[in-house]
Amino acid sequence: MAPKRGSSPAIAGHCSLILSRGLPSVRVTDSNRQKKLIRHLHTFLLYLPADTSCGYRPECGAASFRTRQSSLMVSSEMPNTSTLRLCTVCASNNNRSMESHRVLKEAGYDVSSYGTGSAVRLPGLSIDKPNVYPFGTPYNDIYNDLLAQSAERYKSNGLLEMLDRNRRIKKAPEKWHDSQKVFDFVFTCEERCFDSVCEDLMNRGGQLNKIVHVINLDIRDDNENAKIGGRAMLELVKALNSKMQECDQQGVPFEDTIMDVVADWQQAHPQLPLLYSPAYY
């Protein structure tokens, strides 16, 4: 069922929609009842400003946002005291996830990065012959291999600069499915990576009963858009971290408020469609 547009809950609290895995869409008019449903039914609360439309993906329990206008208020800079464990994910753990890794690391966050592809694939000297490497191949080795193939070609398309950045951050690209680390937030950079992460977490069985928030930002796979996406991801992380600290101080469950944060962020970044799904370790 396609949700109808309404007014922002900041203006009219009656226009809220609850979307739940395996449950029909439910409209709720009372804010206290909203919170109870979120806590007890493990639902996803989505606020719909008048200029926002949304979609729900029952196959992965994800809420998606599409916004046409921007009105996010940027908070003043504060020292980073976050203890969040973050993760960025793209297909090959080379461009988008590594640029976001760099940005978040330089901002002082505890961050790791991974790829979900079957192998690391980078453009080759011809379109039909990409360079393919196993995950775990050191960035320095990949750099030297491309340098030997054609320094001029790979310098002009930015691959050598990208790999030089990567080898300064960590040793080699890592595969998501081989990682046993536990994160608070996982940020993927395209929908197929989001689906892969959600499916893998579901297959792990959730034995730790530890919630993880999986968020996808649809970032185009080129140098410039990777930088744009990295900056936007940092802005989202700052907003989420600030809200978590606020919730801790007020004794409010963060899960009740996360959709406010992502909806505000999406208004400011309509060019980066967002998908969200909670999952469990």
From Swiss-Prot:
Chief subcellular location? nucleus
Q: Return the InterPro entries for the record.
A: RNA_pol_II_suA
Superkingdom of origin? Eukaryota
Q: EC number(s) on record?
A: 3.1.3.16
Where found, per UniProt? Answer: Nucleus
A GO BP term, please? transcription elongation by RNA polymerase II
Its subunit composition reads: Component of the cleavage and polyadenylation factor (CPF) complex.
- Output this protein's name: RNA polymerase II subunit A C-terminal domain phosphatase SSU72
The gene from which this protein is expressed is SSU72
